[in-house]
Amino acid sequence: MQENQQITKKEQYNLNKLQKRLRRNVGEAIADFNMIEEGDRIMVCLSGGKDSYTMLEILRNLQQSAPINFSLVAVNLDQKQPGFPEHVLPEYLETLGVEYKIVEENTYGIVKEKIPEGKTTCSLCSRLRRGILYRTATELGATKIALGHHRDDILQTLFLNMFYGGKMKGMPPKLMSDDGKHIVIRPLAYCREKDIQRFADAKAFPIIPCNLCGSQPNLQRQVIADMLRDWDKRYPGRIETMFSAMQNVVPSHLCDTNLFDFKGITHGSEVVNGGDLAFDREEIPLQPAGWQPEEDENQLDELRLNVVEVK
């Protein structure tokens, strides 16, 4: 019995460290991009997946000690997909005492009616879902819409656009919505997916499957995700370095004439960003930028679904 108690204490200690890391990552992202301000009413989009559960949990945690006052309202869109467990989210949110709204819209039926059998439904479904969430944000008086995309999602989007779209475009931590009426934020922008997965496992969130509509995962995105996971295993620090690169863009050393006035360079122009090194090679640090050793990776791997008692 004593040994079991010691194991539980160790698991709880490791979970606390993991939660502190996620809390620090979210706090830094909020500060860097001014995501949340005094008096904000944040609409937290809750899908029932590990990412949105984690986002809600960390935001609730930060809310208790933040130097500013802000409120949260969780919103789930019930799209009437077959097999969707309607009771799961209301029961979970009522247990937490979190304000919430379940929006019921049969977008599944609309998509099935409009899209021929065998064709991808994701594009239309996404547009319908986005419009409903924007409308709901207005109805609730929300000042910000929080989405659960994390660092890996942002990098995947960058490489998708580079490999298939021919542009360097990622997923913004904060930006105006496409209808120009709402501010969309991604508080998990600095969080690693593997940390979120461990946290979700340890907290035993009631996960709802994401493919109830029967759609297939985006093959191109899956290829990119597999590539990044392989790099993360084989080249420690590469993922951190790539994300750091997204925060240190040097337009003068790229080729976009909209971002830098190359035509305006004449004799007598100032040296910009170190100038052109011509035949000299740029010095590259031995340790990848932004990378820190995983000091407690083995300990964190011990977190499993059986740590239900940790709150």
From Swiss-Prot:
Catalysed reactions listed for this entry: cytidine(32) in tRNA + S-sulfanyl-L-cysteinyl-[cysteine desulfurase] + AH2 + ATP = 2-thiocytidine(32) in tRNA + L-cysteinyl-[cysteine desulfurase] + A + AMP + diphosphate + H(+)
Details of cofactor binding: Binds 1 [4Fe-4S] cluster per subunit. The cluster is chelated by three Cys residues, the fourth Fe has a free coordination site that may bind a sulfur atom transferred from the persulfide of IscS.
InterPro entries: Rossmann-like_a/b/a_fold (IPR014729), TilS/TtcA_N (IPR011063), tRNA_Cyd_32_2_STrfase (IPR012089), tRNA_thiolation_TtcA_Ctu1 (IPR035107)
Ranges spanned by the short sequence motif PP-loop motif, renumbered to the chain: 47-52
A GO molecular-function descriptor: magnesium ion binding
Subcellular location: Cytoplasm
Protein's pathway: tRNA modification
Binding site for [4Fe-4S] cluster: C122, C125, C213
UniProt-listed Pfam families: ATP_bind_3
The EC number(s) this enzyme carries: 2.8.1.-
Top-level EC class as recorded in UniProt: transferase
Cofactor(s) the protein needs: Mg(2+); [4Fe-4S] cluster
Xref: Gene3D superfamilies: HUPs (3.40.50.620)
SUPFAM superfamilies per the UniProt record, alphabetical: Adenine nucleotide alpha hydrolases-like (SSF52402)
Disulphide bond pairs: none
GO biological process per UniProt: tRNA thio-modification
Keyword vocabulary terms for this entry: 4Fe-4S, ATP-binding, Cytoplasm, Iron, Iron-sulfur, Magnesium, Metal-binding, Nucleotide-binding, RNA-binding, Transferase, tRNA processing, tRNA-binding
Function, in words: Catalyzes the ATP-dependent 2-thiolation of cytidine in position 32 of tRNA, to form 2-thiocytidine (s(2)C32). The sulfur atoms are provided by the cysteine/cysteine desulfurase (IscS) system.
Subunit structure: Homodimer.
Other remarks on this protein: The thiolation reaction likely consists of two steps: a first activation step by ATP to form an adenylated intermediate of the target base of tRNA, and a second nucleophilic substitution step of the sulfur (S) atom supplied by the hydrosulfide attached to the Fe-S cluster.
Record-given protein name: tRNA-cytidine(32) 2-sulfurtransferase
Protein source organism: Escherichia coli O6:H1 (strain CFT073 / ATCC 700928 / UPEC)
